[in-house]
Regions:
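Structured, hydrophobic secondary-structure cores that serve as assembly/anchoring elements
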Residues: 2-314
């Protein structure tokens, strides 16, 4: 078509084009691979957005290779949006995440929220993984990375008109057993992240978000400090200098409730003559992480008027 007048209105049909709105799994992987190098790209929270199990597995691989980032993932839209039965939604969510491998570098949530899109002036369903990552970032801001981002203190999801899937208590318990952190709306309290598990299936300290992010924080900080020991002599002076750097840092983390106790071993017991001859430097750091409360038991006991509490307590 040749345009000869700048003011004339023309109706032109386009053919053989591609709107390019739906990125393939391979294209998404190419984009997220920009985060692969932990030395040049500093990122701690990776949001999966809307994607299938293969996409989430690809992101877990990126996070596990980096060892300093956590992936946040939601189920597929079709699992919860437009599904009228809540039990079917729960079954869909559990089934979807059962197909994703175990890892402490991923966090699963239970679905989608309905919110206003001010850029398009419409209401739409969006996956909750962006919100959960936002809660983790806000926890860093108002507390520390080793605090849980869940609960009524730090786990309120903003801007949610409603949830596509609002699980009941029984459904939340089943989701939690399946490594899925439920997001639920409570009357008068708001929409809340009601779990802090990672995607690790085996019982471990690292099956909690706060513990995984605690170790990421510790490992990044201490690894940065250890670089100053490179090309120094592996003698008692260097080892004492390293301990004097690490121990005050761990005491500060302990004072800020991240760990309950720690031990740093960096002496001749683990830096033997063989280690020194290999031009290596070894430090062993033992920590006891603080654990978040997941279950609360309240017992109310009625006593007679004349009974002393000293007699019945305990």
């Amino acid at each position: 078509t040749t345009f000869t007048a700048v003011t004339a209105v023309s109706n032109v049909s386009l053919t053989n084009g591609n709107d390019g709105t739906a990125a393939t799994v391979a294209q998404k992987l190419t984009a997220y691979q920009k985060f692969q190098d932990a030395e040049t790209v500093d990122v701690g929270l990776i949001m999966a957005g809307d994607g299938n199990a293969t996409h989430i597995d690809n992101l877990i691989t990126v996070a596990e290779n980096r060892k300093d980032a956590v992936v946040f993932a939601s189920p597929e839209r079709s699992d919860v949006v437009g599904v009228s039965d809540a039990n079917t939604q729960k079954t869909n969510v559990v089934g979807f995440f059962n197909g994703i491998r175990s890892s402490s570098y991923v966090v699963f949530d239970s679905g989608y929220k309905y919110q206003y899109d001010r850029y398009s002036d419409v209401y739409r369903y969006v996956p909750l993984n962006g919100d959960i990552a936002g809660l983790a970032a806000r926890t860093d801001l108002v507390a520390d990375s080793w605090f849980s981002p869940a609960g009524l203190n730090r786990g309120i999801v903003r801007g949610a008109v409603k949830l596509a899937f609002n699980p009941t208590k029984e459904q939340r318990d089943e989701l939690y057993r399946a490594r899925v952190n439920p997001v639920a709306t409570f009357p008068g309290q708001g929409t809340v992240l009601f779990g802090d598990k990672t995607g690790l299936s085996a019982p471990s300290a690292f099956d909690r978000i706060n513990v995984r992010r605690l170790f990421i924080t510790l490992e990044k900080a201490i690894s940065a400090a250890s670089k100053f020991q490179l090309f120094e002599f592996n003698d008692e002076f260097t080892r004492a200098n390293f301990r004097n750097i690490v121990e005050p840092f761990l005491r500060e983390v302990q004072g800020r409730r991240g760990i309950t106790d720690f031990l740093v071993v960096c002496d001749e017991t683990n830096n033997t003559g063989e280690v020194i001859d290999r031009n290596e430097f070894i430090a062993e750091i033992f920590v006891k992480p603080a654990r978040s409360i997941n279950f609360i038991t309240l017992q109310f006991i009625a006593t007679r008027t004349g009974v002393s509490f000293d007699e019945v307590a305990g």
